[in-house]
């Protein structure tokens, strides 16, 4: 097990956490803020000293990404059938969409500018979970990633998905998932690793218990 694989599991856990939260939110209209906050915070961590710092630091990242680590272990291990199919689809779609984004430098530049603007807004609100912060992150997704040819189709209860607050949360979570997918790629992660490097990734995930 390499240190690179250990770092990759952090990004992978964040991807699966985002995917699972979207799946839950789309069906119930509710989301666990303890799992949501570190994902949204990660969008503003543009100069983090380490991968761990992006999700809360050495002592907190493991707890912050506990849901994602659980889903990652299930998805890569023998419990794959227990993972919500929508969660798996969202996770793979996030990786695919980020790959398309990486080939669009102008859009990347726009996202960077918008993140800087959102970071300034945070000073006016108590938390990144404030509805205005979530709406700003959602708007960033709409103005950029929603314009690519590949779009993530979210399935759930229309009663919830038609609510502006829920729709904003969904897009904000997807944006955080793109952040995680970008980190995954920067750390050398590839989609085929989820098939052919499953044992190594599982070992790294288990080592973080």
UniProtKB/Swiss-Prot annotation:
<dbReference type="InterPro" id="IPR035932">
    <property type="entry name" value="HflD-like_sf"/>
</dbReference>
<keyword id="KW-1003">Cell membrane</keyword>
<dbReference type="Pfam" id="PF04356">
    <property type="entry name" value="DUF489"/>
</dbReference>
<dbReference type="GO" id="GO:0005737">
    <property type="term" value="C:cytoplasm"/>
</dbReference>
<dbReference type="InterPro" id="IPR007451">
    <property type="entry name" value="HflD"/>
</dbReference>
<keyword id="KW-0472">Membrane</keyword>
<keyword id="KW-0997">Cell inner membrane</keyword>
<protein>
    <recommendedName>
        <fullName>High frequency lysogenization protein HflD homolog</fullName>
    </recommendedName>
</protein>
<keyword id="KW-0963">Cytoplasm</keyword>
<comment type="similarity">
    <text>Belongs to the HflD family.</text>
</comment>
<dbReference type="GO" id="GO:0005886">
    <property type="term" value="C:plasma membrane"/>
</dbReference>
